[in-house]
UniProtKB/Swiss-Prot annotation:
Induction: By macrophage activation. Residues 60-63, 126-163, 214-248, 310-339, 407-409, 511-523, 578-581 are extracellular. Functions as a permease involved in the transport of the cationic amino acids (L-arginine, L-lysine, L-ornithine and L-homoarginine); the affinity for its substrates differs between isoforms created by alternative splicing. May play a role in classical or alternative activation of macrophages via its role in arginine transport. NCBIfam families: 2A0303. Disruption phenotype: Intracellular polyamine levels are reduced in hepatocytes. Infection of knockout mice with parasite P.berghei (ANKA strain) sporozoites results in a reduction in the parasite load in the liver compared to wild type mice. Belongs to the amino acid-polyamine-organocation (APC) superfamily. Cationic amino acid transporter (CAT) (TC 2.A.3.3) family. This is Cationic amino acid transporter 2. It comes from Mus musculus (Mouse).
Amino acid sequence: MIPCRAVLTFARCLIRRKIVTLDSLEDSKLCRCLTTVDLIALGVGSTLGAGVYVLAGEVAKADSGPSIVVSFLIAALASVMAGLCYAEFGARVPKTGSAYLYTYVTVGELWAFITGWNLILSYVIGTSSVARAWSGTFDELLNKQIGQFFKTYFKMNYTGLAEYPDFFAVCLVLLLAGLLSFGVKESAWVNKFFTAINILVLLFVMVAGFVKGNVANWKISEEFLKNISASAREPPSENGTSIYGAGGFMPYGFTGTLAGAATCFYAFVGFDCIATTGEEVRNPQKAIPIGIVTSLLVCFMAYFGVSAALTLMMPYYLLDEKSPLPVAFEYVRWSPAKYVVSAGSLCALSTSLLGSMFPLPRILFAMARDGLLFRFLARVSKRQSPVAATMTAGVISAVMAFLFDLKALVDMMSIGTLMAYSLVAACVLILRYQPGLCYDQPKYTPEKETLESCTNATLKSESQVTMLQGQGFSLRTLFSPSALPTRQSASLVSFLVGFLAFLILGLSILTTYGVQAIARLEAWSLALLALFLVLCVAVILTIWRQPQNQQKVAFMVPFLPFLPAFSILVNIYLMVQLSADTWIRFSIWMALGFLIYFAYGIRHSLEGNPRDEEDDEDAFSDNINAATEEKSAMQANDHHQRNLSLPFILHEKTSEC
């Protein structure tokens, strides 16, 4: 009996969820000084990195040709789906933590730790790799003199390590960590400055491309490409066409355009850093959704414009994969423009570096404040900055940039990001179908009047909710549910979302590794494909039939459950495409994370060790007021359910920094 009780207690620890209250939402130990413009600049700077100067040429030459503009459109639509899910959670739970926090309040502690631990890896590798890229780009402008010096005197001949230690990258990371520790307001100004320069350079590229471009480069004939291949003595492709495709706007067909879209999807990664600023924004419920959606729109316009200008200036088959824009300007005899491009590239790398470094200490801070990581990381400076987490993040990233060859580790960034996207989309589905009780809004809320009609309707239906929650599960409640969500319908949706993720995983594996069997029309593959598709559609339609919570927040994802479900499909499919070596490295990282969680985090979690407010104030500026000594497990669950459904709206609030 005792072992069973211990196992049950252990299982409850893994699925316990974070309690978020109105009191904890309005208070913050961090400096509330960021505006909507700051968030847009942060999102654009983080997302619109140096990839815009390189990725367009690489994808256009190898996959899409001139139809790269369509590839970016498809990738942008897929990214917007994830962005909208982040935007809703940013409006519901405007606290520091991003996907880690959203997972914690919805599906439990273990998944939250997995999400946060992977985000830490993604941001560390991102910061280190961008720092080395900045160092390498600057070295190129100096004719590689810095690299030659370190190769001569500090060469490292060890497997897995870099060719030489990058002292310049270390200085860059530590300088940025110092800037972030000094204050978020100053960091925001630096980011806006470099982002503005980057945007101006990209506008110059677009205008120059459209002026010097030629529409004929989008209409190259297949015969012309065959002649070029023959003159270069290059063998034709398997289908008899040129190795450069069939010409025209889609030389590699629509499959090539889709392949390019899968690569272009990663160009929109980075907007999630906006979601980590919930406690540093003056009006988070409005600023975070606007910042995410606007930054993605600006980035799409930039990628679309640059790729169009590039393929108009120069035939796609002549594009240089490493430096497409400088080579294209030389092709149209505007050689001096390459210096403008180099300046823009350095500015883009600077904003991308800040965009990778900015959210990392905030994830560490949020996890440490909740007790899942070492609590010294939750210390806040007098300038209201998470100084301990920032300096720790800077040191770790600097060591990575100093010693390691990060090319083999970059794919691991994708796992953390795609997993976070998938979980946030799943959490939106689960949260929107939870039953909710109505609580009085804070009397200082200026937006309260806009929500009163919904609130009154919910109050009138409170007795009906109580009656419905007593019903048991049956097929009738499955296909003909009540008008209001109940605990049974919420549990059903939670199960169906998990089952849908499992089905999508199976479908992705089948279409990735069994595509040849499907092409040969083998019976087993077609049967599995049909089964997965039918079950996915049935699950989504069943979720759609369930009643949603009618309470409103400042932003809500449209087209539920179809949009989040499609976002989960895209993210899981891209995760399946990653190599086995990447998953092995990921397993090692997760083993280290589980060691920390089960040795430290599970015992020090605030949700498992409730304290009163004064204790939390002393414990490294922890401002969570939800946990009180007298709450029982049932009270915590009821409190969690009702708080998640509240339309959290705070007034614009600033603090002295």
